[in-house]
Amino acid sequence: MASPDAEMAAFGEAAPYLRKSEKERIEAQNKPFDAKSSVFVVHPKESFVKGTIQSKEGGKVTVKTEGGETLTVKEDQVFSMNPPKYDKIEDMAMMTHLHEPAVLYNLKERYAAWMIYTYSGLFCVTVNPYKWLPVYNPEVVLAYRGKKRQEAPPHIFSISDNAYQFMLTDRENQSILITGESGAGKTVNTKRVIQYFATIAASGEKKKEEQSGKMQGTLEDQIISANPLLEAFGNAKTVRNDNSSRFGKFIRIHFGATGKLASADIETYLLEKSRVTFQLPAERSYHIFYQIMSNKKPELIDMLLITTNPYDYHYVSQGEITVPSIDDQEELMATDSAIDILGFSADEKTAIYKLTGAVMHYGNLKFKQKQREEQAEPDGTEVADKAAYLMGLNSAELLKALCYPRVKVGNEFVTKGQTVSQVHNSVGALAKAVYEKMFLWMVIRINQQLDTKQPRQYFIGVLDIAGFEIFDFNSFEQLCINFTNEKLQQFFNHHMFVLEQEEYKKEGIEWEFIDFGMDLAACIELIEKPMGIFSILEEECMFPKATDTSFKNKLYDQHLGKSNNFQKPKPAKGKAEAHFSLVHYAGTVDYNISGWLEKNKDPLNETVIGLYQKSSVKTLALLFATYGGEAEGGGGKKGGKKKGSSFQTVSALFRENLNKLMANLRSTHPHFVRCIIPNETKTPGAMEHELVLHQLRCNGVLEGIRICRKGFPSRVLYADFKQRYRVLNASAIPEGQFMDSKKASEKLLGSIDVDHTQYRFGHTKVFFKAGLLGLLEEMRDDKLAEIITRTQARCRGFLMRVEYRRMVERRESIFCIQYNVRSFMNVKHWPWMKLFFKIKPLLKSAESEKEMANMKEEFEKTKEELAKSEAKRKELEEKMVVLLQEKNDLQLQVQAEADSLADAEERCDQLIKTKIQLEAKIKEVTERAEDEEEINAELTAKKRKLEDECSELKKDIDDLELTLAKVEKEKHATENKVKNLTEEMAVLDETIAKLTKEKKALQEAHQQTLDDLQVEEDKVNTLTKAKTKLEQQVDDLEGSLEQEKKLRMDLERAKRKLEGDLKLAHDSIMDLENDKQQLDEKLKKKDFEISQIQSKIEDEQALGMQLQKKIKELQARIEELEEEIEAERTSRAKAEKHRADLSRELEEISERLEEAGGATAAQIEMNKKREAEFQKMRRDLEEATLQHEATAAALRKKHADSTAELGEQIDNLQRVKQKLEKEKSELKMEIDDLASNMESVSKAKANLEKMCRTLEDQLSEIKTKEEQNQRMINDLNTQRARLQTETGEYSRQAEEKDALISQLSRGKQGFTQQIEELKRHLEEEIKAKNALAHALQSARHDCELLREQYEEEQEAKGELQRALSKANSEVAQWRTKYETDAIQRTEELEEAKKKLAQRLQDAEEHVEAVNAKCASLEKTKQRLQNEVEDLMVDVERSNAACAALDKKQKNFDKILAEWKQKYEETQTELEASQKESRSLSTELFKMKNAYEESLDHLETLKRENKNLQQEIADLTEQIAEGGKAVHELEKVKKHVEQEKSELQASLEEAEASLEHEEGKILRLQLELNQIKSEIDRKIAEKDEEIDQLKRNHLRIVESMQSTLDAEIRSRNEALRLKKKMEGDLNEMEIQLSHANRMAAEAQKNLRNTQGTLKDTQIHLDDALRTQEDLKEQVAMVERRANLLQAEVEELRGALEQTERSRKVAEQELLDATERVQLLHTQNTSLINTKKKLETDIVQIQSEMEDTIQEARNAEEKAKKAITDAAMMAEELKKEQDTSAHLERMKKNMDQTVKDLHVRLDEAEQLALKGGKKQLQKLEARVRELEGEVDSEQKRSAEAVKGVRKYERRVKELTYQCEEDRKNILRLQDLVDKLQMKVKSYKRQAEEAEELSNVNLSKFRKIQHELEEAEERADIAESQVNKLRVKSREIHGKKIEEEE
């Protein structure tokens, strides 16, 4: 086996940066360490430091740190240190002591050794090294390929490879979640993941070249090239990171069936678009701007009309402009190359650069404020021209759209003015929108290019998203990011600890399941649930006047004090203001909500968007083509989601994308990578403790440790534990005796002095609490030290003894050598010895010569043989080479064929498996889709219903507002409503009758629906979910109703306030009326003068209108002239340019002529002609220039003259305009006041009408319930009478049943023997339990599924046992039949038995086949776990278990044979059988539990054999049948047993009911009646089954099984129906009493309402009569006024013109009375008018003198006129009398008008008081009804609880599914009818509203006529006064003339 260092050699130069060497590990383990005194201690500056405990006193610990400090801290501030062997451990979850300082220092020490990757349980934590490390080299990629996680050091490649291998083996999508703060290395790790997949799964196929011939690459190149492009447009420099990703992304890499790359796509989230227009001082904008300006591609500078200096552009120069670590020029080339590789067309590429340049130009757009206005106007057009050119727009249209956007008001568009700041904000928003949409569009295009249309099998998703952020200033973006991390942490907790706890469950450890994912639920719900932060934010965005303050107030009202996660922040000095705090899992974050509403709405200038949509740049038009009709998806989703006409807020879009992301992640197997930034200064190797701890908390690493400590984080396999810790007590495990590892571990731990509550034994592992394993390690180290010390002593002793023996042997050898040397020295001079020395060599030489001769001969022979063999060898080698070549060729062919065959087989197997899986998935998805479609349809209908109800409620509110203002108009509408309600109640009665019939029909069709039980149960679950959702929606609506009630109370208070204001207004109006009268007297003197000036004013107004029209025409003409001037200028510029070109050409030609010298005469003539043409063109150009200048001068002069004239006219009209505007503003104020009053009153009225309608609906519902209850009571009475008649018969049957039950006691012995046998089998099954443990572990998923099936089967078994009692009666009835038919059926039973035996044999064969298949599956799983041998043992044990099952079945046969013999003895002993049956039931329950435990271990065999298991269960049940077959006997036995217990209960109920009350007797009789009908039906069905048995035995078994199931269901259904009827009866009785009480109260309320309406009608009639009187009086006044006017016209025809002027002046007078405050300004104008009028008076006096002259000329005719004068005097006297009479009449009329006013006010007050009283009565009644409704709701809630309980029971079986579905349809019909009802109510309300509007218009018309009559009376009075004066003057003149 290779050493660890040798294994690490495969990593090359990266090995030291990945894992410690073996030498370092040994040195670490040998470090001196004291586990009791070595600790971590809390330090004020460095968070934690290492130290040594000096002393402990009174809860305080004194620690000496490594730096020499001595600290005294509390005990809980000291943390134990891990042993040295855990130093730089690769997986921190394996540490003995899990706490913050241990994690921190492990990361720190590994980081100091440049090991930047560390595991922490499921996490991989990586620390940014801030330097290049050779850990991503190609050899590292290859070294990690195919390695398991524990086989290789921690690395991002290991995570990637594990995900890849899991995808291939588990056939499941994978995801890698990479999170961390900015600068922690998320993007780098993401790129490394993509690099790894692109390397190991490269398809190697070139993409097809497109026709355009643009640059293409492989799919791997394109995936890798997507990063530079996205980084250029989505990355920027921040304070912490020079290349920070300012967006999140989820990259999905799709693989084919063989694991090769198939395609990829990208989704992006939360692009920081605000960086486009603003950067902090130490940051800069996105890289692409600076890459373009790097001048690497000068053609871009020219194309984009920009410079190379970033400071020329405001948007990109607010921070830094260069980054030392980034070469913008190289990055530009990489970006440009990536665009080409990714397949963007040339036009698209140009559009990308142009739009980027346009964004830069946008930042330089300047605007200024117009003089004397707030309107913005462009300050120069050069920048706008550049931006418009790049965007394909018209510059003038762009500036106009920015300064004068068009806004839609109603159905019309209105031009709106913008201030400078508004325009700048609009430009910034547009720049950000263009950049963001372009970025998202590029992602879509990248996805289209990466979609190769190759078949996809699975994908691996890589999530690179910002980590948790806690800044000094946290805004909306931080909330979104933190919320995302909150959801991801919840996902991690759920995933990690669900797996952890599932392992506890799998290992059989007692553990209460804890959902750690719920730890974060409170914070998540606070943010995203209804009425959460996002919900309130979106709601505020819908209100036009909402502000940040109102948003904050709503947050406080909704959550402050109600949620622990929502807090009010404490103000801190030196920090930004915070408005609220949220308690996240990573800490408490203070948020500032400034500008959240605008950020969430993200408004854009729609006028500019319209220009974008018409842009000549197709890409820009495409970006905004669907603006307003499409919600933008995040990132790379193809297409978008329609959202209709409504806008989608940023928060809603963010939540939608987040939900999609979480759905994607939940469908995958996740892997987690947490990136850590070690320090703020980007210093390699340095680590700041507090910063790292903060990130560990934010990333959830410490949270994971916290939760991990609650469980058993350390676990060891039994074999490993036994081997490692046996040394602690070797005597507990004796040598030479085999002991199971689990038992050995239990004995070993039991013999050690440790806390035995700190560990648990699983099936395969022993689990330890945190810290206990470290204690065992310490004990093991101590024991090993002791053992090693003894071993060293023994070894040293043994070595010394060996050394001693060696020394003794050396001594003896030395003695021997010395002896021999001494002897030789003594004999070496002896002569004979010398002779021996001489002769001895000679003897050897003679022999050697002979040997040499022989050897030469042999050498020659051998040489010849060698030559021959060499020749043969060469021939053979040549042949061998040829054969080897042929062999290799054949082997290659065979290998190729084998590989291709294996690949084909593998692909075939994979395709078959894939097909099966896909078919199953398709089936599941289809079923789920159908269910979801049904749910969606139901939810959509419910949603529409709720929306309709909401809209109708709003409309009802509006209707009620009008109704409250005119309460007296409601009588007719109420009568119509009552009639409609009566009709609808009749319709509902008919509907209820129909529904009752349908219910009966459904009960009759009940048997047919039983076969669909399983499908319908699923539907019930979905319906229940839908119901819960609807209940939640109802709760939300109830909450909104409470808010509406609060709003109503506020409106009531506002109404009372407005009523007080109205009274004050009335008082002020009376004062104004008095002032008016006084002013009338003053103004009458000026009437004549005003009448003349008024005509002039009208003429001036007409002239002003004409001048305004003329001004507009002139302005239009000016614009046209300006356009013409501009055109002339352009043409002039062109002409100038053309002239310059011609002159330049002329000069060039002249130069050429001079150079040519010897030109011919023809050339000279041509030159002269050209010169003449040039001269002519110059003259034409000069003439055109002069003409243009003359035209321009004339136009300027004309424009100046018209401007001067218009200026004078405008000044004249301006004064008139100001006057009219003042009048208009005051009228608007009055109209607003009246509208607000009307609105408040109408709202209150709407609330009342709404309550009335709800009460009427409740009344109708109560009436229908009452009638239904009455019908049920009648039915129950009839049933009661019938049951009483049958009581006697059932009493007799009960006595028979008593005798029958007494016989059952004899079966006790048989049952007890059966129980003993089953217990014996149970013991055998328990013995097989351990053998099947490993098999169960590998098939745990299948076990879960089959366990659910088994539980269902056990429930069915329980139901069969309950049905046993029913079969007892059948046995009694069939006994006679069996006695008569026994002989005939014997043969049939024998045949059936043979067939059953054959089926049993087939089943056994099927079992064996399934066992073989299970074995193969087990081998596959165990091969992955290196446990093939264990699996074989498990399979054998499983076969043994099957044999045990067969044996068990035979025992059942024996038991049933005994039952046949003893069945006749079970008909006696009633009293004893009751007690014994109870004990028997408890024993059976225990047996059932034990049997369940045994069968839990056999469920692996049932996974592929569901049908077989069902057949075996059927056989087991069929064996119990007495006479027909073994299977029937088993069923009959269970039937009899269950029937016995149920009949006992029935008899007990019967006896109790006979002794106590008649009600219980009725229930018993109902139950017995149902049982009787069920038994009769079962007898008939059994007869049919017997007939079928004669025809086809196999079909009989199946039909009997189905029939038995039907009987069980029907019997349970009958019991349930009985209980349901009882519960319904009780509820209906309660509801009947409440309904009666409510009906009486409703009738009383109706009578009160009708009385109130009568009073209101009386008031209305009085008001109408008053109005008729006023009309008559007004008509009389009109007639008199007309007479007076006619007389005045007869007397003075010349005053007609004055009369017309007078009317106009009177109108002005009325306006003046309404504007008392403006009279002072008008008086000044009247003084000026007076001067003009004095001149007019002079003219009138001259005319008067002319008239006197005419009178003097008539003196000659005086005598003739004396009589006429006398007559005229008499007529004058009459006229004076008439005038006096009219004066009196006028006064009387004035008094009458005043009285009418008073009466009208009184009538209005009475109406208001009556309305108030009525309102108060209605409010009191409403409160009473609300109280009753609350009580009714409480009672209904209790009823609903009963209904829910009933529904839960119904879910278990069949009937209610169909009934619920029909109920839903019925409710839908009822909803439709109710909607029609609501619509009819709405129509009635509209009719009432129209009637009230007609009456209101009549009243206003009458009031207006009255005012006109008053005006005419005043006019008549003034005319009479004038006539009086003139008549006096004439009379005086006549008297003077007579005198």
Swiss-Prot record:
IQ domain sequence ranges: 784-813
Region (Actin-binding): 658-680, 760-774
GO BP annotation list: muscle contraction
Positions of post-translational N6,N6,N6-trimethyllysine modification: K131, K552
Alphabetical list of InterPro entries matching this protein: IQ_motif_EF-hand-BS, Kinesin_motor_dom_sf, Myosin_head_motor_dom-like, Myosin_N, Myosin_S1_N, Myosin_tail, P-loop_NTPase, XRCC4-like_C
N6-methyllysine PTM positions: K36
GO molecular function, one term: calmodulin binding
Chain spans, region Hinge: 839-841
Gene Ontology, cellular component aspect: cytoplasm; myofibril; myosin filament; myosin II complex
Coiled-coil annotated spans: 842-1939
Residues recorded as bearing Pros-methylhistidine in the entry: H756
Keywords assigned: Acetylation, Actin-binding, ATP-binding, Calmodulin-binding, Coiled coil, Cytoplasm, Methylation, Motor protein, Muscle protein, Myosin, Nucleotide-binding, Phosphoprotein, Thick filament
N-acetylalanine PTM sites in chain numbering: A2
Main location: cytoplasm
Top-level division of the source organism's lineage: Eukaryota
Ranges where the Myosin motor domain occurs: 87-781
Disulfide bonds: none
Binding site for ATP: G180, E181, S182, G183, A184, G185, K186, T187
Domain observations: The rodlike tail sequence is highly repetitive, showing cycles of a 28-residue repeat pattern composed of 4 heptapeptides, characteristic for alpha-helical coiled coils. Limited proteolysis of myosin heavy chain produces 1 light meromyosin (LMM) and 1 heavy meromyosin (HMM). HMM can be further cleaved into 2 globular subfragments (S1) and 1 rod-shaped subfragment (S2).
Subunit organization: Muscle myosin is a hexameric protein that consists of 2 heavy chain subunits (MHC), 2 alkali light chain subunits (MLC) and 2 regulatory light chain subunits (MLC-2).
UniProt-recorded name of the protein: Myosin heavy chain, skeletal muscle, adult
Lineage of the species this protein comes from: Eukaryota, Metazoa, Chordata, Craniata, Vertebrata
